[in-house]
Structures are given as C-alpha cells and as structure tokens.
C-alpha cells in the first residue's frame, strides 16, 4: 500500500504542474507589484529623508517625535538629512525646513496659514477651530485674528507700558513671596505672575488668584504639548487621558468663572466707552452672533496664557545670560541711565533702547523658547525646486536656522551678532507674513519694560555653576527648562542707584 502511494505512475504529473504554476506565478506577480509600488512611492520624492520601507519609516519617525519632543526630533532629522528633508508625522508627509529661503517662501504665502496637529488632541484642549493659536480652520481663524491684532497694538500697546511697569514694581516689592528659605528667587514663578497680572489688567480686568492660575496654566500647557501629535488610538484609552483631562478642565473651569464675572459686569455697567477691552469686544461679538460662546472663552483663555507660557521663559533665559555676561549688564545699565534715568519708563523710550533691543534679539536667537513653526500646505506648490503637495505638513526649524546662516558668531552669545542690521529673512523669532505672531510688537516692548524696571533695581546672579548652556531643557512644542531636575533660582541683590555704574 505504501509503495503504491509513493509510485509516481499513480499521478498525472502534467496536470499537477499546470495547476501549481499559475498559483505560483500569481504570488510572484503580486509580490513584484507590491515591491514596485513601494519602490515607486519612495522614488516619487526627491526630498532627502528616511526610507518608507513598507510603512516602517513613518512609524519610526512618528515615534521619534513622541519620544524626543517636536523640537529635538526636528534638530535630529535636520542634522541627519540636511536643511530641507522629509519625514512622516501621524502618517502624513511632513517637511522639516531650516533653510532661510524656504522658510521665507512658506511664511509669506497665504496658502500656508493653516497649522497641523491631532484633531482629537486639539478638540481635547479646546483649540480645534477655536481661538487663534492652533485654529486650523482658515475662515474661523481670520474671523478672530482682528480682535487680537487690535488689542495687541495701538492704544493697548501704549497702556501696556504703564500697566506692566506697575505690575513689576508691585511684585518686586513682594519678592519674598517667590523666595525660598535662603532668599533665592524663583524667577520663573515671578515672571509668570507678572505676565499673567499684566495680561489680565490689559485684556480681561477681573481680579484673580495669580498663584493658582499660574499652576493651572502650566498644567494646561503640559497637556497641550503632550497631546498635539498623539495618535487617535491614544484618546480611546480613558485612563491614559485622565491626567490631561483634569489639567484642561481645571484651567477652563477657572477661566469660565472669570469670564462669567466679566459678562455680569458688562451687563450691569452704566457706561462702557472708557473700559472696552479685548474680552468686552469678544463678548459683544458673541451677542451679535459673530462668534460662539465657546470660541470667545477660548480666545480669552489663549490671550491670558500666552505671556506666562512663553515670554516668562524668554525673560528667565535672558536673566541667566545677563548674569553670565557682566559686560552686557554694564552696557544695559549704562543705557538705562542715559535714556530713562530715575523717572518711569515711557513708550517713547522704546526706540532709544538699542542695547536692550540687541540683547533681547541675541537672547532669542541664542536661546530661543519658540524655535519652530508648524504649518500645512493648502495647495500644491514648489519650494526651492522641491514639489510640495496639498496637505503636506511643514515644520520650520527657526532655532537651527538662526545658528546656520548670516550671523558672524552663530554659536556664541555676543551682541556682535546684531551690531549690524540683520535682514529679516535671517532672523524670525516671531515669524512674519499672514500668520505671524499677532503679539510680536507688544512682546518686544513688554520685554524691554520688564528688563529695564527689574535691572535698575536689582543685580542678578545665578547659583554657582548654573548657566543656560548647562541647564537641562525640554525641547518639544517649545523649549523650556526642566523644572524637575535643575536648581533654577537666582540671587537678586538690590542696587544702589547712585553707584550702579560702578559695579
């Protein structure tokens, strides 16, 4: 029986081969077609970057962004593949650019006014098609931007000088509130409280608990940064989102109470002409049916968190740089004495504070806080010879560009880098074009007011061995010091105003 089974005469070999060959041929053809598809996909892009390799490339690049943070991942990829390269984020083709000519092209054209990020993540924090910062609906973004532009320029900018100077003086008079037992100053907390107080006085005008709101703002920012590029599956696992949900809710609930108080005051006021601020304008727009209630609340929230979130960290880095460079401090103090003297700072002083302005610019170049810009192409285009398809994500790596082009000593902190006029295409800390930072002018003026008011009263020092270069930092959506790992306090020594130039 066994021999019969093994005997080939019992089988029609020809028929067996004819059945097997088509199946094998189909399998080979399918495999060949698949490999050609993958090969063709990779060949369609002449832009440098990691390999697609059966979809593994996009998975790895997205994981790298989640693991390293957006800013650190951008620096890694630009260093690896050049100043114009391609990766994938959330499965979407994403360009990372640190070349000035390409950045200039993206920023100046209106078909790059949209940003990108996880829709579910932005919905989670309330920014999806609301507010201004990450509102990716061009029509809705255009509807709210004029409110921000009006509030951050003209009379609002002039009022800010006095309000900000008064806030700094008030907080410096209560410096013990942000000092530890050794008398060291928690500069980040101090700056965040000053920025929040100034923003509130300018844009909302409702008394609030600074210390509590500052903590809630930090929690909200952490959630925003953590969720911006998370894959959709993350939001289906409730326990992963719970911590962020609480942080977002804490700030939104606190803001809701403040905004409701604002609405009440508006509805009961006999006269509003002399006190129409940013929040009032938005609430009137809501009453006219131009904006939704949720959008109004988000706009006010974003206006109040912007300065405590970024400008406070910028000034923190500046004070560390001043402490390390006494010759810069001397030049600043000399200019303050010449331009301002012993009187209060005024709006007409701003153009005369050239050393202070150069110092601010060099600080933002050397140690940026916002060192990237995220955009999305709304139509097909060509950038520096590379084809860019509609829907492509783009990250402009400003921090890297500021150390690659034009500046004579790009890797050093020195005011020589701004001794001559810098063409604006080579230095863009706030961006430019239709989606430039709406607060770029008021931010510069506010930083001048902070530095002048603080430095005329105090000489600043870091703790031994502390400096910006050695500080542990997190470079994600923005670049912040790691507050869990470093001693970030400073020593404030009161100046003798009559002898401040002798130091």
UniProtKB/Swiss-Prot annotation:
Question: What molecular function terms (GO) are annotated for this protein?
Answer: aromatase activity; estrogen 2-hydroxylase activity; heme binding; iron ion binding
* Pathway assigned in UniProt: Steroid hormone biosynthesis
InterPro entries associated with the record: Cyt_P450, Cyt_P450_CS, Cyt_P450_E_grp-I, Cyt_P450_sf, Cytochrome_P450_Monoox
Please report the record's description of how this protein sits within the membrane.
Answer: Multi-pass membrane protein
Q: Where are the transmembrane segments?
A: 19-39, 53-73
Give the binding site residues for substrate. 309, 374
Listed under GO cellular component are: endoplasmic reticulum; endoplasmic reticulum membrane
UniProt-listed Gene3D superfamilies: Cytochrome P450
Gene Ontology biological process terms, A to Z: female gonad development; lipid metabolic process; response to estradiol
Specify where it is mainly localized. Answer: endoplasmic reticulum
Name any cofactors this protein relies on: heme
Q: Which domain of life is it from?
A: Eukaryota
Annotated signal peptide:
none
**Family to which the UniProt record says this protein belongs:** Belongs to the cytochrome P450 family.
Q: What is this protein called?
A: Aromatase
From the broadest rank down, the organism's phylogenetic lineage runs:
Eukaryota, Metazoa, Chordata, Craniata, Vertebrata
Q: What gene is it encoded by?
A: CYP19A1
